[in-house]
Amino acid sequence: MSKRVLTSVAWPYANGPRHIGHVAGFGVPSDVFARYQRMIGNDVLMVSGTDEHGTPLLVQADKENTTVRELADRYNRIIVEDLVGLGLSYDLFTRTTTRNHYAIVQELFRGLNENGYMLKQTTRGAVSPSTGRTLPDRYIEGTCPLCGATDARGDQCDNCGNQLDPADLIDPRSKINGETPEFVDTEHFMLDLPALAEALEEWLKGRNDWRPNVLKFSLNLLKDIRPRAMSRDIDWGVPVPIEGWQDNNAKKLYVWFDAVVGYLSASIEWAWRTGDPEAWRKWWNDPEAVSYYFMGKDNITFHSQIWPGEMLGYAGKGSKGGEQGELGELNLPTEVVSSEFLTMSGSKFSSSKGVVIYVRDFLKEFGPDALRYFIAVAGPENTDTDFTWDEFVRRINSELANEWGNLVNRTASMAHKNFGEIPQPGEFTAEDQALLDEAKQAYTVVGDALQLSKFKAGMTEAMRIAARANQYIAAQEPWKLAKDETQRERLATVLYVALQVVSDVNTLMTPYLPFSAQKVFETLGGEGIWAAQPEIVEVKDESPYTPVGVGLPEEGSSYPVIMGNYTEQKAIWQRTELAPGTALSKPKPLFQKLDPELAETGPEWAPVVKD
């Protein structure tokens, strides 16, 4: 029986183009997962968008001498184009500066406030002395007062896992310009997390299938849980929908309060854009539906504490009780899938320091599947990993081109040359049957890995089967059989077995490498869409949903979204038995080998930096 699977993907900031470190964390893993879920017959809703509020955009707008809205519009479009180029199969990729998003965010806030989970408190806020602008928690660094780590942030210390306030830090400094912030009294709405702690703990203790590091970190957060500010002294963001606050342009909702609501607001937008305004409830209100959230490790707290806390409070599930809001009881995350960090030649990605590889540049030179493959086999799934051009060239040449691409090309070429079609096999030998059985069993092995978000393990098994097929061909020597007319039936059998395994491995790799999977499908005589791709759709900003928002963006502006029709694709997670007599297409090389010199120099737009 099929399930409804919500795939919620972290929202990239629209303050610049995205680099490969970003998509290694939130992009490719979530897409591999969603594509696999569709192939096994589940009803997937994959949503995200650009995060367009908060200080990062204000800072970048100042640097570029433009308005923050113009900046958001520009980078929203660039990011949309890049993610489509990478083949990320969103059902809807939208943005946070829409009328719909504002209205849904404010509905959540009002529900929390009415249930008593929003506290008005005076706190100490950090301000930049040179600009007078509020500094958000994450833009302040200093020494942790609890463990002594010198790189603690104003919201938490990654070294010891404790929550912090900026004023807690020893020797605090601004990440923007290094100056010491001033701390002033300011009034804010605080999410009463202590009143939600028991409900959060009960939920977390039932998450036994999470990655151990994510679960341990999330449970540790509860040990020092405290109210957390959900408004900010800032003039760019979602208005606070409370009388006396909603018209105050100097105070807006915290960017992380509204960003996590984006998964819900995007689902609601998708529903009415596809003609069924209530369809989102199938993924959010049905307790049988499941939800998976993909992000980098620095965002775990917002997805295992803040967002679940917001949903619990909105439903009246904390210690203060309360009434359920009109959006209903919202499903808590089934799993929070966190990736570690990808670095570049040992350094953190940094646009300002030139340590960066932008997605757009990468796609233009190497194509999407090369990047998707590298992230799958060498990405930061469980530990921080390093991107080097040397490792990239080695992986592409020895694995993707030599092992997989060569298998496809030589098998299809021999079959096309000698038969022009899928040949009719004779009786299988023990060696033939062993390889066929092994390839068929791999559907279970790879599928189990993908269900648990173990992407490296899944690709490793698929490549192992490809290697076995290459060994089989080397042992059977079909090029010799082709020279002996009496071995015609054996040649047909060997090539049939090899082609069937190529088809199997191609299916196993479809979630990872959808672009090349389509080519292999067509080479084997397939017609139609094997692996569907997303597309860009221009839409108007409208908000037909019922919650009444305040201070909404102007109606009618246009913006690009990513959508796609993935229901008609032919890819399914099972062996497709090849039909003898099916015409083969003349194969073309699947992957080009890279110049070995690239490993030493890097491309012109991202050269290797010599010590």
From Swiss-Prot:
Similarity comment: family membership: Belongs to the class-I aminoacyl-tRNA synthetase family. MetG type 1 subfamily.
Chain span(s) of sequence motif 'HIGH' region: 12-22
EC number: 6.1.1.10
Entry function: Is required not only for elongation of protein synthesis but also for the initiation of all mRNA translation through initiator tRNA(fMet) aminoacylation.
The protein's enzyme class: ligase
NCBIfam families: metG (TIGR00398)
Keyword Glycoprotein: no
Catalysed conversion reaction: tRNA(Met) + L-methionine + ATP = L-methionyl-tRNA(Met) + AMP + diphosphate
Gene source species: Corynebacterium urealyticum (strain ATCC 43042 / DSM 7109)
GO terms for MF: ATP binding; metal ion binding; methionine-tRNA ligase activity
Identification of the protein by name: Methionine--tRNA ligase
Principal location listed in the UniProt entry: cytoplasm
Name of the gene encoding the protein in the UniProt record: metG
Domain of life, per lineage: Bacteria
Co-factor binding details: Binds 1 zinc ion per subunit.
Cellular location(s): Cytoplasm
Cofactors, names only: Zn(2+)
GO cellular component terms, semicolon-separated: cytosol
One Gene Ontology term from the biological process aspect of the record: methionyl-tRNA aminoacylation
Binding site for Zn(2+): C144, C147, C157, C160
Keyword Transcription: no
Residues reported in the UniProt entry to bind ATP: S351
